[in-house]
Amino acid sequence: MHRPPYDARMRVLMPVPDRDFDVTEVAVPWRLLTDAGHDVIFATERAGTRPACDPRLLTGVLFGRLGAAEEPRRFYEELNRSEEFASTVGWADLAPEAFDGLILPGGHAPGMRQFLGSEVLQRQIGGFWELNRPVGAICHGVVVLARARTVAGGRSVLFHRRTTCLPKYLERSAYLATAWRLGRYYRTYPAYVEDEVRAALAAPDTQFARGPRVLSARGTAADDTHAFVVQDGNYLSARWPGDAYLFGRRFCEMLEAADGA
């Protein structure tokens, strides 16, 4: 049954670490969801923490390059001034049933480990997954789902799902191009993201989709030519910041479909 118009505003949960998340992967979905009339509720490990992005992505990772594009940076500035960004909910205090959708953004700098490795957050996400509501993950955010377990059976929630994530070749290329100056900045963990995600799948050769090869070309607000996402039922995944606009638009469509179910 279609929900009445007064209930069309959906509540989307977006957990983030205290620092080092990706500018584009947070700010673009936030902007698109907000423009569509939805509420985005941010969650940090401790309630009331004002989170901060990876600062290198605002100025350029190396020689002013490899950072976020101008529009996502502007979106982030708007987000950083918003009330919801300072009024975060604590991970342990989350009630999964209170949200209509869940987005897990990525990032690769060291501060992301707080988010990627939290067993508390993984349990909460496992609980939300059981509700069969829209879930989206982009880049390293897919790792959280790979580590989250179903309530029954103890397998990853992704075990039977099709998915993408940050491709191994892209993570490796970024590391090799910058290691001389930034060390392991692009290597969040010794294992590559793709390797960990594939290991969580029942049949990785058929369930995992790497997508077209990219190195620098990105999707934009007006052009999805270089963007790629994978949708499997209520689950949506994307590879990197270059997919963020398509990812955000598709997630809005998933919310609308869920609202009309």
Annotate the PLM regions.
Residues 1-131, 144-261:
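Extended, subdomain-level signal for the structured scaffold at the beginning of enzyme domains
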Residues 134-135:
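Glycine- and acidic-residue-rich phosphate-binding/metal-coordinating active-site segment common to enzymes
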